[in-house]
Amino acid sequence: MKSPRLMLFLCALAGTAALAGSTVVPASDSWPDFRGPTQDGHVGDANLPDSWSETENVKWKTETPLLGLSSPIVLDNQVWLTTATVEGHEFYALCFDATTGELTTQVKLFHSDDPQSMGNGAKDNSYATPSAVIEPGRVYVHYGHFGTACLDTETKEVIWKRDDLKCWHYRGASSSPVLFEDLLILTFDGADLQYVIGLDKKTGETVWKTDRSAEWNDEHIDKVPIQEGDWRKAHSTPLIVEIDGKSVMCSTGAKAAYGYDPRTGEELWQVEHEAYSATPRPLYHDGSFIIVTGFSKGAEMMSVKAGGRGVVNDTHINWRFDTSFPKYSSPILVDGLLYYAMDDSFAVCVDAKTGETVWKGRLGGKYRACPIVAGGKIYFFSLEGNTTVIEPGREFKVLATNALATDAPLDDPRRGPGFMASPAVVGDAMFLRTRYHLYRIEAK
């Protein structure tokens, strides 16, 4: 029997997920998913500061061991991260005290004698990039091919582990796990195998597994891909929403985006596309999913009506365009307008109903982390360690720009980008992970 606290948590999470894209969001007392309780970056009425620096509005700053790019997850005064050795031999879960910043737990979970190489993807990835998910009493951590584990948040003991779910990640794993009812749902979009899988969150046992069904059109007669590598890869995390009383999971893979029944893994519909390495998480707004398909000349951003059966390209696409869309960072939706940061230093605002560009403004920098909206303001976090705060609306208006130090010794393998992990917000505090530190930002 579920505890009353767990029931309240799950009901709140399910209710806010169904409101994806709405600006009416309750104040956040936890951050259970890398895009928050609503899975779309909405914080609610948090009173975050507009400005901060290494000496202003930083409650604490703690060094994070080893290397990981996963986003912070917060519940019950615990901040959870994952990390790994730079070469990918050892994999850990980390727990910090949210009040003091103290590292209270470092649990070694997996070991690899011969880790998969990430090739030139190592500059944008790590061996601990998928973010954890948490609920009262349990935290779930995932390292792709290397393993998945469930830990007791009180004792820090391992409840279950799996290390038999395989694929060749080619440039490393990035897709984060998703909790849904009694399931933990994982995404494996490798260069060789592509599938989504639902595990019993209590035991780790497989409940369902569904292979991607895209028409690859890149095979020899013996089903071996003509070109191995990126062409079948994706990095996106699914979004689950409730539509007309039924749960639908939207998941973007290479060559197609899919709608699934998250309870059974049944494929409901498919939108074919011509791209690979999709990274942004889908959004849901007014009966449609907003999808970014990834890289290649055929990559695009599109709005797809939820529903239908089979391939729905001819019947369910509202709009699509193939320029000025985000390749890495997920968009955010406020009052019918989409906002996102591109990798060329610009932010873009698009009408979610029509796909028409409202404005384009220069932020500066490059972007991997996902934006948030809090207290009526949108926050963008750059690779260079800067945060730009803008006012939502039909005109581009910058309210503040803030910087945190990202310098590191030249021989430090972790030196480089500031924000690749997305932020977490609980109450009026924001938790930011750079390559080598975790910060708590809060007005003093």
State each model region's role:
Residues 1-6:
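Positively charged n-region of N-terminal signal peptides that target proteins for export
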Residues 7-18:
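Bacterial N-terminal signal peptides
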Residues 21-444:
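Noncatalytic, solvent-exposed loop/strand surfaces
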